[in-house]
Amino acid sequence: MNVGITCYPTYGGSGAVATELGIALAQRGHEVHFVTYKQPFRLPTFLPRVFFHEVDVGRYPLFEFPPYDLALAVRMHEVVREHKLDLLHCHYAIPHATSAWITKQMLKEEKRDIKVVTTLHGTDITIVGQDPSFHSITKFSIEKSDALTAVSRYLQNETLSAFGCTACRIDVIPNFIDPKVYDRARYDGQLRAQFDGNSKVLMHISNFRPVKRIRDVVRVFAAVNQAVPSVLVMVGDGPDRGDAEKEARELGVDKRVHFLGKIDSVAPLLAAADLFVLPSNSESFGLSALEALASGAPVIGTKAGGLPEVVRDGETGVLCPVGDVEGMAHAAIAILQDADRWQTMSRRAAADARERFAMDDIVEQYEDMYKHALA
């Protein structure tokens, strides 16, 4: 198949999943064309059967806001025609599914067709899509898709609740990991020594937005460090970074907290982690949690959104109510102070991630969906 993929290319779960899916499809013999405004951050410079088509958003004084959705539709139309695409796979509904529908209408005028598959990732439904400014166009765009997926049962239910979507079927296809990449044994432990070879390593990876509650990450760490000598590694960047740095200074742990900024390849870092901390208000899936589990790092998180579908509470991690810093810290301390328990949870985490979320199995589900949409 010739597949077009549109996603947000910047740091974040939806773009990472879309890119990894495209690479995996190309490895299985498909031709993949990424159509977006910038090369996706996880896409290498060159791979066989993988192509990148940049969207040029013209800037004119008349437009206060450049019309990316229209420019994207034009570029999609060009790529479909030039490369004879079989389908467009849109990751994140707004504006990608809308642009794909416009493309579909343009092709219809030429007596041609393109199938549109839309994957819902989270905030496109739970936040952006429910904004009154976008609600009706979000509902329209996803209902006009030829196939529709959500990354978790939680998000499937949220979509049905918020939009009805009686005219469409939503299949759940979860995010995935490449077991070979997230293999703790692949990495030599040098990164761990750089942090502090004698301390436990707690880690957090996100876009540092309010929903991630990264000040809670620092608070949990401060409590853990009082009982178990530890360091905290913070990977990512975003609007709440300054508040987290301030929190670390006020709690007197700033010398033991490492802010590394955005890093594309997180597997070597996760191989050095003893625990992964994710105290979010909500997670539609929790890709970073899955990557941590696959690396053998138990997750301390919240009973929020789709996270309980990823983390088996009490087996591969511990989930607490949102905002329960004391509970999360207590759980982390209990695990870190019991070497046998940590080993058991670490093994279970890695095994469960591979059993339920292995790349080959999930990519095959997408291939089956493509075939069904094209039938």
List each language-model region with its residue ranges.
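A short, well-ordered alpha-helix in the C-terminal region of glycosyltransferases
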Residues: 327, 334, 341-356, 362-368
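Aromatic "clamp/platform" in nucleotide-sugar-dependent glycosyltransferases that forms part
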Residues: 262, 281
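Nucleotide-activated donor-binding/catalytic signature segment of Leloir-type glycosyltransferases, i.e.
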Residues: 245-261
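N-terminal strand-loop element at the rim of the active site
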Residues: 7-11, 23-68
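Carbohydrate-associated surface elements
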Residues: 154, 176
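Conserved donor-binding/catalytic core segment of Leloir-type glycosyltransferases
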Residues: 149, 195-221
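Conserved acidic donor-binding segment of nucleotide-sugar-dependent glycosyltransferases
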Residues: 313-314, 318-325, 334-339
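Short hydrophobic beta-strand element within catalytic cores of glycosyltransferases
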Residues: 298-301, 311
